[in-house]
Amino acid sequence: MDNTLKHLAIIMDGNGRWAKLKNKARAYGHKKGVKTLKDITIWCANHKLECLTLYAFSTENWKRPKSEVDFLMKMLKKYLKDERSTYLNNNIRFRAIGDLEGFSKELRDTILQLENDTRHFKDFTQVLALNYGSKNELSRAFKSLLESPPSHINLLESLENEISNRLDTHDLPEVDLLLRTGGEMRLSNFLLWQSSYAELFFTPILWPDFTPKDLENIISDFYKRVRKFGELKC
């Protein structure tokens, strides 16, 4: 199998702790985190990656205080509108994954509009995981499979493909490298199916402090690793 880094996935963790260290409100950390998101996205677009998936809002994030959730929704809508030119000028295709029905119609329309405006770009895709959780995604895939089962008899042999084709990421490559900032060492229900053979990297750097140079160093480490994909390699 190909060892080239095509799909990078990032759990952007540490905005709140970063703001606390600065004696600022959590919203301040989220705003700085958006700038990091933009910088990392443009770097990836310019360095021949095929796909960057960013964990922006999880199905569990609704449990946060309503004031913070409301702020995040407003910030997301503003980002998608304000950065439209960034996507167009850098030939970036935008995709959203997750249970978008959980959002307001206005926000869903904003998401769909940017997807539509950038759908013709082929070289690089930025994916925002929004109201996303792997358990939710797999549940929706299984529900789809039960509601419209394939007609062929040999289901067990093709079950993996049937599930993959019903995931939000059906048109994207498998994850090669999954990175989490902020020091925590868990996957937090993120791309569990798609990361079955991904290399994992955990850095203590808080997301607002994370730079393209930090990413370069991590990618350099990625290419030093031997990816076996279950095979024996000497």
Swiss-Prot record:
E.C. numbers: 2.5.1.-
CC cofactor: Mg(2+)
InterPro entries tied to this protein: UPP_synth-like, UPP_synth-like_CS, UPP_synth-like_sf
List of residues binding substrate: 14-18, 26, 30, 58-60, 62, 64, 180, 186-188
Active site residues of this protein: 13, 61 (proton acceptor)
A biological process from GO: polyprenol biosynthetic process
Swiss-Prot/TrEMBL keywords: Magnesium, Metal-binding, Transferase
GO cellular component, one term: cytosol
Residues reported in the UniProt entry to bind Mg(2+): 13, 199
GO MF terms held by the record: ditrans,polycis-undecaprenyl-diphosphate synthase [(2E,6E)-farnesyl-diphosphate specific] activity; magnesium ion binding
A Pfam family it matches: Prenyltransf
Cofactor binding note from Swiss-Prot or TrEMBL: Binds 2 magnesium ions per subunit.
CDD domains in the cross-refs: Cis_IPPS (cd00475)
NCBIfam families tied to this protein: PRK14833.1, uppS
Homology family: Belongs to the UPP synthase family.
Quaternary context: Homodimer.
Protein name: Isoprenyl transferase
